[in-house]
Amino acid sequence: MDYYTILGVAKTATPEEIKKAYRKLAVKYHPDKNPGDAEAERRFKEVSEAYEVLGDAQKRESYDRYGKDGPFAGAGGFGGAGMGNMEDALRTFMGAFGGDFGGNGGGFFEGLFGGLGEAFGMRGGSESSRQGASKKVHITLSFEEAAKGVEKELLVSGYKSCDACSGSGANTAKGVKVCDRCKGSGQVVQSRGFFSMASTCPDCSGEGRVITDPCSVCRGQGRIKDKRSVHVNIPAGVDSGMRLKMEGYGDAGQNGAPAGDLYVFIDVEPHPVFERHGDDLVLELPIGFVDAALGIKKEIPTLLKEGTCRLSIPEGIQSGTVLKVRGQGFPNVHGKSRGDLLVRVSVETPQHLSNEQKDLLRQFAATEKAENFPKKRSFLDKIKGFFSDFAV
């Protein structure tokens, strides 16, 4: 029979609708609710087989295209590799309800069976992965290294795969056998009261295999402690707080499981001259009031290969004005573009003047015209009106 018909859903059903339909039927035909009922057991296996296919996006796509006997269905098609025994059907059942057992409650079974899942120590979902642990290291870069990119060698402590046994944990290939209790699945299904549950196999600790002749070097773990040098290529444009992920450079997994990842966290030292704002650089440039009045061309520092660039400061520039030098900022870490260099001009008032300098400034002040100081004139006009309002 068609899997969609078995679950009572349309071919356009969403994954959530398929799961909901399966849950309802699986509870209805569960053998613990129908003891000794052969037809209920058959239907339970049937709906479990249908969900095993339709609940998996890849299997469902193959089934929709080719039917039960499609090229990706395995030997004998989907049905031939389906729920031939009750243990497989119960495992599918546990997978569909896994996230709702025990724990902090509120799930489907807690409402249906009064929290029996927690009472029996049920675990949600599949067993945790035995992949090696991920590692993290911090690296400090100079401002220039972050701007240009750099290669670094890091010394990382952790676990590596045991060379003596190639990570298997056994002296020889014959030193490993399939667990007799769980038949290699890593889980055992037990019937407790009203329903059945899957739990980690106690004989193999969920590995699915038992090492009878452990490696003398790693003592059956498949890995050993190690310190190694890791070459890291840090791209230009990184900033503090960013991290680089190096897949497979973490701890080796136990008994041949995949290695974890290495995360390199970046810290960038501050620069004495530049501030960074995204990909833009900000440079505070102090100039004298004469240069501000007359205008000037100045050599200013940059992070580019040339080291400097010439900046034209227009006459009459005011303190706080920002001049933009395009393309002289930080490179974007995700592409080929660069930010800009933003030069914030700070006009400095002279201090500790000599008598001669003071006399020259007084002579200049005597020649001032209103148009020389438009802001000053505007301000005086405003306060003149302000005081006239309070005149008696």
Swiss-Prot record:
It is found in: Cytoplasm. Residues 2-67 form the J domain. Zn(2+) 2 binds at residues 179, 182, 201, 204. Zn(2+) 1 binds at residues 162, 165, 215, 218. Keywords: Chaperone, Cytoplasm, DNA replication, Metal-binding, Repeat, Stress response, Zinc, Zinc-finger. SUPFAM superfamilies: Chaperone J-domain, DnaJ/Hsp40 cysteine-rich domain, HSP40/DnaJ peptide-binding domain. GO terms for cellular component: cytoplasm. Binds 2 Zn(2+) ions per monomer. GO terms for biological process: chaperone cofactor-dependent protein refolding; DNA replication; protein refolding; response to heat. The J domain is necessary and sufficient to stimulate DnaK ATPase activity. Zinc center 1 plays an important role in the autonomous, DnaK-independent chaperone activity of DnaJ. Zinc center 2 is essential for interaction with DnaK and for DnaJ activity. Belongs to the DnaJ family. HAMAP family: DnaJ. Homodimer. Participates actively in the response to hyperosmotic and heat shock by preventing the aggregation of stress-denatured proteins and by disaggregating proteins, also in an autonomous, DnaK-independent fashion. Unfolded proteins bind initially to DnaJ; upon interaction with the DnaJ-bound protein, DnaK hydrolyzes its bound ATP, resulting in the formation of a stable complex. GrpE releases ADP from DnaK; ATP binding to DnaK triggers the release of the substrate protein, thus completing the reaction cycle. This is Chaperone protein DnaJ. The lineage of its organism: Bacteria, Pseudomonadati, Chlamydiota, Chlamydiia, Chlamydiales.
